[in-house]
Amino acid sequence: MEVLSTSSPLTLHSHRLLSASSSSSHVTSIAASSLSSFASSYLGISLSNRTIHRFSTTPTNLRRFPQRKRKKFTPISAVFERFTERAIRAIIFSQKEAKSLGKDMVYTQHLLLGLIAEDRDPQGFLGSGITIDKAREAVWSIWDEANSDSKQEEASSTSYSKSTDMPFSISTKRVFEAAVEYSRTMDCQYIAPEHIAVGLFTVDDGSAGRVLKRLGANMNLLTAAALTRLKGEIAKDGREPSSSSKGSFESPPSGRIAGSGPGGKKAKNVLEQFCVDLTARASEGLIDPVIGREKEVQRVIQILCRRTKNNPILLGEAGVGKTAIAEGLAISIAEASAPGFLLTKRIMSLDIGLLMAGAKERGELEARVTALISEVKKSGKVILFIDEVHTLIGSGTVGRGNKGSGLDIANLLKPSLGRGELQCIASTTLDEFRSQFEKDKALARRFQPVLINEPSEEDAVKILLGLREKYEAHHNCKYTMEAIDAAVYLSSRYIADRFLPDKAIDLIDEAGSRARIEAFRKKKEDAICILSKPPNDYWQEIKTVQAMHEVVLSSRQKQDDGDAISDESGELVEESSLPPAAGDDEPILVGPDDIAAVASVWSGIPVQQITADERMLLMSLEDQLRGRVVGQDEAVAAISRAVKRSRVGLKDPDRPIAAMLFCGPTGVGKTELTKALAANYFGSEESMLRLDMSEYMERHTVSKLIGSPPGYVGFEEGGMLTEAIRRRPFTVVLFDEIEKAHPDIFNILLQLFEDGHLTDSQGRRVSFKNALIIMTSNVGSLAIAKGRHGSIGFILDDDEEAASYTGMKALVVEELKNYFRPELLNRIDEIVIFRQLEKAQMMEILNLMLQDLKSRLVALGVGLEVSEPVKELICKQGYDPAYGARPLRRTVTEIVEDPLSEAFLAGSFKPGDTAFVVLDDTGNPSVRTKPDSSTIRVTDKTSIA
């Protein structure tokens, strides 16, 4: 017998003839008889009866062609010997279906009918509920070929024994080619109906798709079902089919192929041991859906389609979705929605930790990598995904500091990557790519970079909507659309050191966890509250339950007597009477307030809706500040306005809360106002970051703010300013006495005031968008202190006009223009000029100082009273309009604190006494003990204030 080569597409696969089956003689004769027409129609060859007899009796002789024939003719591959009995049965059914419809060729819709007829699953074709009768009706309705009852009966009574000579169309032959390719991809040594089904759904010319659409079936779901059935069958033994599952697959008669011995199994174990099959996980639904990124995925597919150097490397910051792109590609392959050349591929994710773990001996890691590369090259259908690929660079014996005979892992990958033998998708960050890959030009040119940028807020919302179902199922909750929008908006605005969509996903994840825990806590508290109530509080509920119980009992009694109500109506009464109980599995609603609460805890920035208590705090903020800072109403109003704008949400989101410059004489309350704001609104004075600019008088001290440059001490520690803001972004930053700093310090403030961020010595961008920036300056105070002949060009009179606020403000602003650069002054939101303190205001300041002194005496158990003449004396001696309140503080120390300390040392006071400061007959202050009913005891701390 001579076997001639043919122009069929399957000749590309080196066809051979089908060997005899090792199954029963009946099935063998069926396969042999049907294969004659199958081979003749598909390949254009003829098999005589003698040949068929040789098929079933002497399979080994048929393979041994004479050497002369081998040299002259192209051999035909072992495609048909790999068809299982079920596959042959499906092909015969398809021929019968085509003949019953009056066709002279088998098209893809007939092949679909054959596959459906062969599938004996009670749930229909691939578990979809599609039966052969429904499929025939769909085909007849589409092509208007409704047959008579006799033809239908003939089609339904097809048998294996009847042979046909029905040829196959070109599109059907392509389906067989795709089935062969997918079988090779899965390392299966047979072709089952599921392989043919996957090939049909992959390269369908549209005919089978029309039938499935008419039946209401989803082609992607059917493909996934076929893949699941195939992979479930072969999962027990690596890539070998299971011999025990006769109901689904039969082992091909030819047995295992050459090369599937221990050696092949060992290489196979290397791939399975160190890699995770992302395609299989996607088929099982274990990978989250991937939304968007169409351009990046298209670019990756283009690179994978190249002949050489077909290795994309995904570059992007942590959290932008590099790994998700590889997972999305695996999902598209599993759902058969990827391009055709990728459908035969598997994406295997390399676990670098497993690869390196346990490599104790020298060269053991290199041996693992070499075996892994060999297995991937041998398979030819594996795309290796290496996440954080920079961890492999520098590993190996060379990277460990050893000398000689060691290899870097990158050097092992280079040859295979360059020739296209090893196809790889890598991912790393931009910094690691710059530091690791760009140093090795030979390695970098083998990868094609694909830049993965942070998605926009709109795209991030779409991503969260796609993931919402997964997180709702995990937390047993429901996310509102407002919660999704809030997660993206709040994370983008207030979490500066992370990237979308990762930080938004983390927000909804933690918000779901928080809502679930809060619901459990509330349920527990309600249960405890119910148990603690007296019966009178819920007597009405008890009466309602008793009434319902009586109705149910009467209904059951009537049913027993056979009087009125049937079982169905009785059930209706019982079910309708009882109130619906709130189940434990009822989903919890997660709204924007839950998202805001998590964002506030995470970032330290109050982003929740303004509560009633906080609203009252903001409304009374000015009064609280005036109670501590006297005589500076303009400054108090200015700083209060800035805080209110920020909290309401009207401030510019790309700039700090405010950048203010406090100018005025010394000792008038510039620093004290900042401390008061930090204590009243930000929690405490410790929440204020104060930088005394007298420490930055030299040029090189600018490094103290943002961090030392490389090579200097403290490079790894970061800057005092930037590190403090990174840890507490919602704070007050005080640059005290800014004019004392070196002029180069002002240059670094320009970007801070305008753009709201600084870049530290580590290259990290630090956001100041939630910080209140305040600078204090004494520019102009020297002239005021000198009195009449000031240094800023004006003369002060003895009367109050010389110290007027308007004149002082104009002169100080003019002096600021001469001292600071215009670009700095132009970026300051508001310049606040502090007034000089009047004599009447000194009494209020004195009362505040005495209250502070009383608070300190509480720890000693002694009260304090100061007579009015002593207060007037203190104000008279401590008042100096040029120096503000600081002389007053020194006078209090001299007149009150020093005599008190002497009296304590002399033992004049015991706990419970009250120190009374009065003037003696000579007009000098003296301290006396006042043990009467008004004495303040040690435990009575509240009366001090």
UniProtKB/Swiss-Prot annotation:
Tissues expressing this chain: Expressed in stems and leaves.
GO molecular function annotation: ATP binding; ATP hydrolysis activity
Cofactor(s) the record lists: Mg(2+)
Residue range of the transit peptide in the UniProt record, numbered on this chain: 1-89
Region annotation (Repeat 2) ranges: 168-233
Start and end residues of each stretch annotated as II: 590-781
Principal subcellular localisation of the protein: plastid
Presence of keyword Metal-binding: no
Subcellular location: Plastid, Chloroplast stroma
Segments traversing the membrane: none
Region (I): 271-523
Reactions catalysed according to its record: ATP + H2O = ADP + phosphate + H(+)
Pfam families: AAA, AAA_2, AAA_lid_9, Clp_N, ClpB_D2-small
Entry's family note: Belongs to the ClpA/ClpB family. ClpD subfamily.
Protein name: Chaperone protein ClpD, chloroplastic
Organism: Arabidopsis thaliana
Gene name per UniProt: CLPD
